[in-house]
Amino acid sequence: MDAKKYLEEGARARLNLNIEKIIGIADKISSAISSGNKLIVFGNGGSAADAQHFVAELTGHFMKERKPLAAIALTTNTSSITAIANDYSYDVVFSRQVEALAKPGDVVVGISTSGNSKNVIEGIKSAKRIGCHTIAFTGRSGGQLKGVADETLNVDSDLTSIIQEMHITVIHMICAMIDEKF
């Protein structure tokens, strides 16, 4: 794909983001944190990086100084990830961590550009069983994750790179709105 078409695809995906849903997600996360709960985020590959970026903006700060906010990325503890993958299966690397760390009222975000990452789906299922509010960040058709999470923010693109760019855009939008509440 040439550069102009790539930019056009990114612009189209950005214009098709559901702003009302994004505002609702920011409100849900803010409310959970204000109530003493936390945000838990996970994904694979570039989505793992997005999960860590999201958490860094909340535990550090985004655009203004504020207190650190309770957020955990389940993609950072390589010992836990590799032990779970080795002893059980890579399919449960997030669900086992969710079972250990989540409590009712937490918000759990699973990021998967295809919506079909088995370990992300299993992590969301575990979070729902615990009583967490679950959110999927997806692309393409939303995949299987769309039918599992309480709500889905789907990027209207089939290009993984564009989906990832829009996920980080959405994460920044959410962090900016959360900043205003704390």
Curated annotation (Swiss-Prot):
Residue ranges of domain SIS in the record: 29-182
Cofactor note: Binds 1 zinc ion per subunit.
Gene Ontology biological process terms in this record: carbohydrate metabolic process; D-glycero-D-manno-heptose 7-phosphate biosynthetic process
List of residues binding substrate: 44-46, 57, 86-87, 112-114, 117, 164
Disulfide bond entries: none
Catalytic activity, EC: 5.3.1.28
Catalytic activity: 2 D-sedoheptulose 7-phosphate = D-glycero-alpha-D-manno-heptose 7-phosphate + D-glycero-beta-D-manno-heptose 7-phosphate
Gene Ontology annotations for the cellular component aspect, listed alphabetically: cytoplasm
Pfam families named in the record: SIS_2
Enzyme class: isomerase
InterPro entries: GmhA/DiaA, Phosphoheptose_Isoase, SIS_dom, SIS_dom_sf, SIS_GmhA/DiaA_subfam
Cofactor(s) recorded in Swiss-Prot or TrEMBL: Zn(2+)
Taxonomy, superkingdom: Archaea
Gene Ontology molecular functions: carbohydrate derivative binding; D-sedoheptulose 7-phosphate isomerase activity; zinc ion binding
Keywords (A to Z) from UniProt: Carbohydrate metabolism, Cytoplasm, Isomerase, Metal-binding, Zinc
Miscellaneous comment as given in the Swiss-Prot or TrEMBL entry: The reaction produces a racemic mixture of D-glycero-alpha-D-manno-heptose 7-phosphate and D-glycero-beta-D-manno-heptose 7-phosphate.
Family classification: Belongs to the SIS family. GmhA subfamily.
UniProt cross-references to HAMAP family, sorted A to Z: GmhA
Protein name: Probable phosphoheptose isomerase
Organism per entry: Thermoplasma acidophilum (strain ATCC 25905 / DSM 1728 / JCM 9062 / NBRC 15155 / AMRC-C165)
Lineage: Archaea, Methanobacteriati, Thermoplasmatota, Thermoplasmata, Thermoplasmatales
